[in-house]
Amino acid sequence: MKVELTAIEARVIGCLIEKEVTTPDQYPLSLNALTNACNQKSNREPVMSLSEADVLYAVDALIERRLVSDESGFNSRVSKYQHRFCNTEFGDLKLTKQEKGIVCCMLLRGAQTPGEIRTRTNRLATFNDVKEVENVLEHLANDEKGPLVVKLPREAGKRESRYMHLFCGEVDVSELAVATTAPSSAGSERITQLEQEVAELREELAALKEQVESLFS
């Protein structure tokens, strides 16, 4: 696998993939909308506090590598960005909808168990059960062009092993262990889902405000 991203680049790509699926009417994203998505408090781990300059620096680097493109029109005053990370005409990385959903979820939240991935990808892809998630993960881990994810050693007291993407290079297991938080309950997962929905509604409102302002500018 040739793609290697910084943490901010991974967040940018993850956000663009997510919004392409969940809010297609607002996609491609303006720099403001993309920055808001990167700093979203729900469905992000770790939570970041990036400036527009931070995000633009990452976007410019990704454009140079043809992983992001500026889709704004000739007379447009606002740049709009879309990812070219996978499933492009000339790109090497081809992912199914399920694979894309899993990769997106990992780019946004890091290492996760198959059960967590199934819950958190409910708006990105459909899985019948956890076993189906595990099968897709195994396929990604054994990709013929090089592994895209890796299965991590099972932690003491945990029933499931976590998986992590390899788009930011090899995984430092000891670092991940330090960053591990307490397991989520079903109630906290529901709260996370509600927080995500509120954040997305705010983004849609911000995008509508942008459109109105552009009409009167």
From Swiss-Prot:
SUPFAM superfamilies: Winged helix' DNA-binding domain. Belongs to the UPF0502 family. This is UPF0502 protein VIBHAR_05349. HAMAP family: UPF0502. InterPro entries: DUF480 (IPR007432), WH-like_DNA-bd_sf (IPR036388), WH_DNA-bd_sf (IPR036390). Gene3D superfamilies: Winged helix-like DNA-binding domain superfamily/Winged helix DNA-binding domain (1.10.10.10). Coiled coil: none annotated.
